[in-house]
């Protein structure tokens, strides 16, 4: 194999693989170029969903995660999956932030409090993460462990919380550690819109023991449903009492608090309420600003009573870069993405897309880095201003292709990456004739660009980051299917025969995933993959 130049990565966003049928926008389309390359060039199918891209098992892929994995050259586990996988491996129970919290609560002889959303909504928290913490407390002999349960009803059914609470009570009974000390809906505890009076109600229950009372959390929820049939999200603060009617331990001086939500946005305010020393000043300034803008203020402005002193606070993930608290699962930084390896080798690169997918070929592909690397040029075409893209399924693909063709013909770039957004963005409309046009547009654009790459002695890798356009009919309802899919995606290598990258000379390994693309591209460029890249090249010599 000789080194091709340039190497093009063309991402056909949302172009998945599925059997032909009336709902398959890809197979319904007239795509002579892609069909020809599929029939004559090295091809394989890639996994682009679930654990293969760092998402929970069975979860559909998406463009952000897809491009992140493509550029990182490794499976980038999302926070929720990192935590879940660490429970399976046992690393969870050796987490330094958790063990430090255990040590502190033992040394002080105080109480452990676990706060967060319960249930299996999976958007902000997972029940297995709370169960893992309870198991850890049992292992470490932290018997004085209290749970402040935020109820969902938004990412779960409105009155599903009763069942989830029964499951939690069963888990507590099996593990032998933990008591639910308070129950409150996420409407209050997880406000993110500076409605401090809502957060104040959660604070009052957890810290002051103020709210409705119930002898157990099941009764608390049943009583709440009678007060407000809207369900879990709107459960007013309820304090759980012991057999003598005394509230279970509140969050008090010297206690340890672990917030087990993995998603940050809806637990920043409750974290500030518990921990920020100048909270009241901040709240007053915010409301003053609201008043200056002529906005309506609440009847009473919540102000925190005296702050609980000497709390030790642990966040499950990084909730805010300015928070000085212990983090159990800090951000995973991608230090050597594909673009950096190429830049460090002194090579030139070109990243291109239209507006809808421009962040994906820049920020996400480059490992969540905003600034371009040395020798990296970025070119964007504006997406059309239409209400929905079925009205203009061609989008701005022709402009993207024209700019890309100019870049190829300039012969100054070693590596080029382009995203054609059409199959995904039009796929989200569920309008099959428009999706067909979208796929045909991408095929036509590739038919202009790929031959130019090959003519220069180069190679093009055609892939998708996830599926979408190949499933436009919901198999359950028969109605439109507008979401991404878990289907495999294509990977086609089209190259100048002189490079030795033909179907007769090489094959593309089966069973690959998006994380294998960066090592494959570096293999084509004759560069060593970064040490952190755990993906492997798809190219196999016959």
UniProtKB/Swiss-Prot annotation:
Listed GO MF terms: manganese ion binding; phosphoglycerate mutase activity
Cofactor stoichiometry and binding remark: Binds 2 manganese ions per subunit.
Signal peptide start-end: none
Binding locations of Mn(2+) 2: 13, 63, 465-466
Binding site for substrate: 124, 154-155, 186, 192, 263-266, 357
InterPro entries per the UniProt record, alphabetical: Alkaline_phosphatase_core_sf (IPR017850), BPG-indep_PGM_N (IPR011258), Metalloenzyme (IPR006124), PGAM_B_sf (IPR036646), Pgm_bpd_ind (IPR005995)
Subunit details: Monomer.
Listed name of the protein: 2,3-bisphosphoglycerate-independent phosphoglycerate mutase
Organism: Herpetosiphon aurantiacus (strain ATCC 23779 / DSM 785 / 114-95)
Organism classification: Bacteria, Bacillati, Chloroflexota, Chloroflexia, Herpetosiphonales
